[in-house]
Amino acid sequence: MSPVQLAEKNYERDEQFTKALHGESYKKTGLSALIAKSKDAASVAAEGYFKHWDGGISKDDEEKRLNDYSQLTHHYYNLVTDFYEYGWGSSFHFSRYYKGEAFRQATARHEHFLAHKMNLNENMKVLDVGCGVGGPGREITRFTDCEIVGLNNNDYQIERANHYAKKYHLDHKLSYVKGDFMQMDFEPESFDAVYAIEATVHAPVLEGVYSEIYKVLKPGGVFGVYEWVMTDKYDETNEEHRKIAYGIEVGDGIPKMYSRKVAEQALKNVGFEIEYQKDLADVDDEIPWYYPLSGDLKFCQTFGDYLTVFRTSRIGRFITTESVGLMEKIGLAPKGSKQVTHALEDAAVNLVEGGRQKLFTPMMLYVVRKPLEKKD
């Protein structure tokens, strides 16, 4: 594979497109936000995303997606952010689950666990790489009282993150910056710690984003990441395995899924020292991490859990898809909205299957450190 070409930094273009597409919809939530979009701009976003996904899994197809990583991810989150918040909440990640623990509680605990493993505290300035709409950052700053800067290449998500920070009176602790995590604009050695929660999977090359994180970390600084990877059981030459990986890629805006070994080696190659690593999806939990997608209502703990899991279950996703299709047909939802829900359905099916076969994990946890002194 030839070297990946870094994206052009055209933040003014992105901002103008965001305003044209989303307008004031960042103040709304769920399907009401979807209805408020510009129909023409949404069609452009859908076309820009789905042009990469026609079933092609050749090296040439893959290389095109890798080289367009920035716009691919930008268009993806322009299309799916409202669906994510409607179905899942404001923390766009999976978690481990225990009996007696509600869905929201498990989400917070998963975030707390990362902060605990990293030893984050109130004296730290921390970078959240790929911060989404700020759900994890809000929880972690409440838990540790640290200052967090969120990095995101999607202007709409930044608008929503700022909206929530002000709403919950956390804007003195939280700030958000537009940027490409493959070419960060921060000064070198400007953060005490960096974390990424299921975000660096969008990088075309893991070594690229990890090297940028290494650069902005102070010597002795810690980096913690929940990484999406294919496990050691995954076989790239196995047609069924590759189909599962492709389904995850197309439905989640990922240029290419990499293996655990690739992620680990990438961390080492840029200079990190691995202090802790564990696949938290492979610990024989009674309740699987993918249960909200598989629709196993028996694991729900609260009434709110039943609502969440129903929305994210196969039946709930079917209802959402058909409802959105009807809204699109009568002109309420932008053209391409139903295609987006179909892609999310493909992702859900393959995430569950990848989890059941232990081919995929969304929570390969690495806690690594930048050495105090450079190695010769």
Swiss-Prot record:
Belongs to the class I-like SAM-binding methyltransferase superfamily. Erg6/SMT family. Gene3D superfamilies: Vaccinia Virus protein VP39 (3.40.50.150). Its EC number is 2.1.1.41. One of its GO terms (molecular function) is sterol 24-C-methyltransferase activity. This is Sterol 24-C-methyltransferase. It comes from the Eukaryota. It is an enzyme of class 2 (transferase). Keywords: Lipid biosynthesis, Lipid metabolism, Methyltransferase, S-adenosyl-L-methionine, Steroid biosynthesis, Steroid metabolism, Sterol biosynthesis, Sterol metabolism, Transferase. Disruption phenotype: Does not affect the susceptibility to azoles. Leads to hypersensitivity to cyclosporin A (CsA) and FK506, inhibitors of the protein phosphatase calcineurin.
